[in-house]
Amino acid sequence: MKLAILSRNSSLYSTRRLVEAARARGHTVRILDPLRCYMRIAADGFSMHYKGRPMTGVDMVIPRIGASITRYGTAVLRQFELMGARTPNPSDAILRSRDKLRAHQLLAAKGIDMPVTVFGDNPDDTVDLLSMLGPPPHVVKLNEGTQGRGVILTEKASASRGIVEALRGLYANFLMQEFIGEAKGADLRCFVVGDQVVASMQRQAPEGDFRSNLHAGGTAVAAKASRAEQQVAVRSAKALGLSVCGVDLIRSARGPLVLEVNSTPGLEGIEAACGVDVATRIIEHVEKLKKP
């Protein structure tokens, strides 16, 4: 199988591990910087060039598209899809996952539980918007923030109003959620490949913080996901159309709640914490996706 990995940095752990796993299973692999891919779109067909040469015959594309290049990266991936390449995470599915509001709407429509979420635009509606959410603490999230950036905890209603006013003044797109205190700064990352959770780890926020993301200073240990948690993770992936993703859950008094579905989850933290060869599981999965 001729496999392309869309990644801006060939030295990243996740990219290197996918290359190693694919080559170990006999596949031809090439790393492509999405920003060096350019395309021709016409009624007579689609074509792609990379650094001055045509890209043809690609069977499978594994996207490792960073948030900062989501639009261009997904356009490149879509072009490969239109040229007949397969992918575990289609371009439209990645776009669904990157828009937190859209993702929450789609998950809720499938009956998947999550922290109560509110969204509004007009400053005149702020007081009523907060009443729909309930009493503080509240969590304010930028709609397209990643790795724990752009997430704020407010402990008083006045602070929530102040943050809302400040973000609107910056024309920022954001949503607000209830704070789940019983989680105690911990969440569960379930790594979904296909229709199963292949590894899971508990991430704990550092002292004095509530964000458990590893990039925000959190720590991780292997953790067993319950049957219910695994089912929620797989359902969440399917709701967005992803077959390789990280689903972040928190354990609450009313059961597992979905925080986020990450379409480009890192491999380093989960492989180190769990001792699972996740990269090979991904390659085994994409082998099944290839057309016979």
Curated annotation (Swiss-Prot):
The UniProt keywords, alphabetically, are: ATP-binding, Ligase, Magnesium, Manganese, Metal-binding, Nucleotide-binding, Protein biosynthesis
**Names of the cofactor(s):** Mg(2+); Mn(2+)
Query: Sorted alphabetically, which InterPro entries does this protein's record hold?
Result: ATP-grasp, ATP-grasp_RimK-type, ATP_grasp_subdomain_1, RimK, Rimk_N, Rp_bS6_RimK/Lys_biosynth_LsyX
Q: Locate the residues binding Mg(2+) 1.
A: 248, 260
Q: Name one GO biological process term.
A: translation
State the superkingdom.
Bacteria
User: Does the record bear Protein biosynthesis in its keywords?
Assistant: yes
State the organism of origin.
Stenotrophomonas maltophilia (strain K279a)
What is the E.C. number?
6.3.2.-
Gene (name only): rimK
UniProt binding sites for ATP: 141, 178-179, 187, 211-213
Q: Which PROSITE patterns does this chain map to?
A: ATP_GRASP (PS50975)
Give an example GO cellular component term for this record.
cytoplasm
Residues annotated as domain ATP-grasp: 104-287
This entry's Gene Ontology molecular function terms read: ATP binding; metal ion binding; ribosomal S6-glutamic acid ligase activity
Which residues of this UniProt protein bind Mg(2+) 2?
A: 260, 262
| Residues that bind Mn(2+) 1 | 248, 260
- Reply yes or no: does the keyword Plastid apply: no
| Cofactor binding, note field | Binds 2 magnesium or manganese ions per subunit.
Q: What is this protein called?
A: Probable alpha-L-glutamate ligase
